[in-house]
């Protein structure tokens, strides 16, 4: 992804894009953040309405998969990977906390909620299937 390709896709001049964004990193971050907010809002909504642990954990898994699928091209872009790698440590803790929040009522303590969130985040990104992940998470939630 380049600012030039973004400008072309939007039908505007490259300079116009730079009027709003300092570079492709800022543009990509805004796009990712906008979708991530929708993802967490949906997860929180399901958590409020759902008493069944498997349903909630499946929702989180499916939302993570959908998010990654939507931005797969961006996650494969070498320049984008360099940017994400540089900021990963800073944002990973925040992502984990956001995913731990809806599962906290299912857990005995904050550590378990963070552990479940980390497992979901890590193993979903690694491509593991829901059934394999949930077999382990179910033991923590019981």
Predicted segments, located by residue:
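Helix-turn-helix
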Residues: 1-26, 30
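A short secondary-structure junction motif
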Residues: 38-42, 67-71, 75, 98, ...
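Alpha-helical structural segments
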Residues: 9, 26-46, 55, 59-66, ...
């Amino acid at each position: 992804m380049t600012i030039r390709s973004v400008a072309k896709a939007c039908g505007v001049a490259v300079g116009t894009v730079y009027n709003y964004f300092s570079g492709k990193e800022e543009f990509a971050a805004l796009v990712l953040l906008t979708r991530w907010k929708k993802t967490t809002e949906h997860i929180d909504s399901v958590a409020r309405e759902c008493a069944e642990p498997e349903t909630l954990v499946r929702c989180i898994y499916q939302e993570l998969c959908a998010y990654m699928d939507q931005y797969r091209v961006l996650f494969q872009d070498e320049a984008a990977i360099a940017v994400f790698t540089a900021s990963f440590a800073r944002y990973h803790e925040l992502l984990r906390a956001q995913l731990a929040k809806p599962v906290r009522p299912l857990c005995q303590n904050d550590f378990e909620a963070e552990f479940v969130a980390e497992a979901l985040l890590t193993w979903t990104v690694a491509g593991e299937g829901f059934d394999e992940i949930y077999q382990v998470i179910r033991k923590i939630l019981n």
